[in-house]
Design a protein with these regions (language model features):
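N-terminal signal peptide c-region/cleavage motif recognized by signal peptidases
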Residues: 3-5
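Boundary of Sec targeting at the N-terminus
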Residues: 9-11
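Local sequence-structure signature of Cys/Sec-based thiol-disulfide redox active-site neighborhoods
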Residues: 13-57
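Short amphipathic alpha-helix with an adjacent loop that forms part of the alpha/beta core around
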Residues: 26, 74-75
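Thiol-based oxidoreductase modules, predominantly thioredoxin-like and allied folds used
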Residues: 39-44, 56-70, 77
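Extracytoplasmic/secreted cell-surface and envelope-processing proteins
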Residues: 46-49, 71, 93-95
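Structural micro-motif
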Residues: 75-87
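Non-catalytic, surface beta->alpha helical segment in thiol-disulfide oxidoreductase systems
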Residues: 85-123
């Protein structure tokens, strides 16, 4: 049997109990990842959730706003989806859905923001 290691990231779920640990980018296993994408998601609007997360090469986490009222309040989430790029625990950029509740950002825009954050952190 041939096994091929996967270097990509999978979409995970977070809630009020672990969101801060995830956003900080610190791993218990010593594999720190400073950039993290968090999507504040709502079941009623699943059709408009960001669907290309498998194409992003950094951790991608969803937070169910119905189950995470503290995180929703702290990050001022009013609409879902709201997507935030964090860099070492700090908000780098936020994309918020409008009244149409459509996903507010494209894969290309997220990739560009990640590239800019990576370049800025090199200095």
């Amino acid at each position: 049997m041939l096994t091929i290691p996967c270097l990509g990231f999978s979409q995970e779920w977070a809630d009020d109990s672990n969101i801060e640990d995830i956003i900080s980018g610190k791993s218990a296993f010593g594999e720190d990842e400073p950039l993290v994408i968090v999507e504040f998601w709502a079941k009623f609007n699943d059709a408009n959730a960001f669907s290309d997360w498998e194409s992003i090469n950094i951790p991608y986490v969803r937070v169910d706003i119905a189950k995470s009222p503290e995180a929703k309040k702290k990050y001022r989430v009013r609409m879902a989806p709201t997507i935030i790029l964090f860099n070492e625990g700090f908000k780098e950029i936020t994309w918020k859905a409008g009244l149409d509740l459509e996903c507010p950002v494209t894969l290309q825009e997220i990739k560009e923001a990640i590239e800019e954050a990576n370049q800025a952190s090199q200095f």
